[in-house]
Amino acid sequence: MNTFAPLMVQGTTSDAGKTVLVAGLCRVLSNKGIQVAPFKPQNMALNSAVTEDGGEIGRAQALQADAARVKPHVHMNPILLKPNTDIGAQVIVQGKAIETMDAWGFQDYKKLAMPYVLESFAYLNDHYQCVVVEGAGSPAEINLRENDIANMGFAEAADVPVIIVADIDRGGVFAHLYGTLALLSESEQARVKGFVINRFRGDISLLVPGLEWLEEKTGKPVLGVIPYLHGLNLEAEDAIKSEQQEKGQFVVKVPVVTRISNHTDFDSLRLHPDIDLQFVGKGQSLSGADFIILPGSKSVQADLNYLRSQGWDKDIERHLRFGGKVMGICGGYQMLGEQLSDPLGIEGEPSLIDGLGHLAISTELKKQKQLTLVEGELHLPNQSSAKVKGYEIHAGVSIHTAGAHLPVIINSESIVRYDGALNHEGSIFGTYLHGIFDEPEAFEAIMSWAGLKESKAIDMKEIQEEAIERIAASIEESLDLSQLWPSLFEKKAAY
């Protein structure tokens, strides 16, 4: 298909705004009636999403697909790295986990990964009119340039034009842009179409002399300056978002384990006006919570040991003695059980450790992951049956022992199965379902069970949609997009 030229967005640093800029450009093009798809050759993240065909990609690419108004697909993020130690990560290729590699092992593997990356890019080119590509980190990382598949290595191999974005809010924006360009090869410099400055606050007339200097020194145009957009409630790709517009009275505490995954599960709580969501870090206590939720984890056994080292297991026991409620999601659910077994060494050395012992389940880690989008019903004590939707990403298989109550009924392709566990007293609930709080009925049932009565869920889809449209409007107003797609946009002043 490929009617319009693809574009790659690279950044001078991590968190320069690449993910949001790609999402915004996808929405701008979609609003023009263009069939557009996002693409990220290589992503490193613990927040992942499940595609309809049972593959796994970065959640950022799923968000960008939403912005493009298309369904997420494994080819949108062919290489996903999910760190499970400080020097190692699980490598996922076109949606499927292949093995865990250390940093040096992956450096060697990259030359083998490029064909998969180019195959996925070709698939998107064949099925969409335009592809907007996101780089990773910075293209100027000298130590990572050999066999690069994430930035200029891909752009050169696929012959894709590039724009470079920098975050002026961090300071040093001209050094970042000038220095990044200077560290590229001549052929790489030639494919850079221009610069974008992101997150600007203040009087732009004060910035103009610097923009003119940059254009003169580099010979590259500044395509525009995007203002700082306050209150954008989009999922965070890496760092946990903790800011709240307003804090409620009902305190929910989440212990931050070392390999916390899919912390976007808690965005519905963080943004709710009745809830004070607190992420509890090293050396802090879980005491004072109305509700405790154990999050997902990429290294469940190691994080369970860390949880104990912080004394959080004792905080949980005390919380339960005083009538509090506890919930576990995915890895947190496994921790609440009786045993955790890793006979194949999926997370390191083969091992068997005791869980917290609050739920009548035992979990064994398997090589094959469960990757599924699910819908069903949630049945909690003293609550009406609630619709539930979510997704499963886990290697563990949990076996229910005597006395386990199964609170989630999943209807999948005419097959009824069960998920989760509830203790005999009805005070502890565990589930494998990520995204469970994003379904309003499930949110209201869980929070009512936990003690927050008659509180209505917020509409996360509407919040995300509003944020994406704000970004798209700002991009279209701020950038001279005619320099990227002249047949679609009229020329305008960039600043």
UniProtKB/Swiss-Prot annotation:
It holds the Pfam family CbiA. Residues 249-442 form the GATase cobBQ-type domain. GO terms for biological process: cobalamin biosynthetic process. Gene3D superfamilies: 3.40.50.880, P-loop containing nucleotide triphosphate hydrolases (3.40.50.300). Keywords: Cobalamin biosynthesis, Glutamine amidotransferase. It comes from the Bacteria. One of its GO terms (molecular function) is ABC-type vitamin B12 transporter activity. The active site is at 330 (nucleophile), 434. Pathway: Cofactor biosynthesis; adenosylcobalamin biosynthesis. PROSITE patterns: GATASE_COBBQ (PS51274). CDD domains: CobQ_N, GATase1_CobQ. SUPFAM superfamilies: Class I glutamine amidotransferase-like, P-loop containing nucleoside triphosphate hydrolases. Belongs to the CobB/CobQ family. CobQ subfamily. PANTHER family: COBYRIC ACID SYNTHASE, DETHIOBIOTIN SYNTHETASE. Catalyzes amidations at positions B, D, E, and G on adenosylcobyrinic A,C-diamide. NH(2) groups are provided by glutamine, and one molecule of ATP is hydrogenolyzed for each amidation. This is Cobyric acid synthase. It comes from Aliivibrio salmonicida (strain LFI1238). The gene is cobQ.
